[in-house]
């Protein structure tokens, strides 16, 4: 009986430790925009002005602007990522960007700075590998992005690729991401 109780406790503790939950607050709903900006300080100011506008601040959105050193498939120099708590907040964030006065001013400033959007595919699949730890906590990653015109044909290829990398120690940190760009 003692062995059964200890075994049950051990199995339960492994389950609790290995449940692979994302950290609290990690968002799986994201809008990511890549672009080319030759004047980073002015691009950052335009982004900050947008994020500090009253109609945006009141939403308490979480966002990052970052430099892109080399992504291997276009000339993007910077990116902006918005992180949402739910699909509803994701939809609302995109609606506010399109319909608000702050969004209009931000888009106008983007045009004035001649910022060139590089995210022009409707569907992009990203394969990412993190350096160590969970993808949500890691600041270093390697990503390949593919323009996929037929997801039904792509899925068997993805499954084969996923199976082929299982032999590598970093495979537990690899992930696939389907992105839908709502515009550039």
Annotate each language-model stretch with its function:
Residues 18-184:
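Short S/T/G/P-rich N-terminal loop/turn motif that feeds into the first structured element of a domain
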Residues 1-4, 98:
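Non-cleavable N-terminal signal-anchor transmembrane helices
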Residues 3-13:
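Sec-dependent N-terminal signal peptides
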């Amino acid at each position: 009986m003692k062995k059964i109780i200890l075994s049950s406790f051990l199995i339960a503790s492994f389950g609790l430790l290995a449940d692979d939950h994302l950290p609290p607050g990690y968002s799986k709903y994201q809008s990511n925009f890549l672009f080319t900006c030759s004047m980073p300080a002015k691009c950052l100011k335009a982004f900050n002005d947008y994020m500090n506008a009253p109609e945006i601040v009141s939403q308490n959105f979480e966002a990052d602007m970052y430099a892109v050193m080399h992504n291997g498939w276009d000339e993007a120099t910077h990116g902006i990522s918005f992180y949402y708590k739910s699909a509803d907040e994701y939809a609302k964030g995109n609606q506010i960007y399109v319909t608000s006065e702050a969004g209009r001013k931000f888009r106008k400033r983007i045009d004035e700075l001649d910022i060139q959007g590089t995210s022009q595919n409707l569907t992009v699949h990203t394969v990412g590998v993190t350096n160590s730890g969970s993808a949500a906590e890691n600041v270093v990653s390697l990503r390949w992005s593919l323009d996929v015109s037929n997801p039904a044909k792509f899925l068997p290829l993805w499954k084969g690729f996923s199976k082929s990398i299982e032999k590598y120690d970093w495979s537990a940190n690899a992930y696939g991401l389907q992105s839908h760009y709502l515009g550039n």
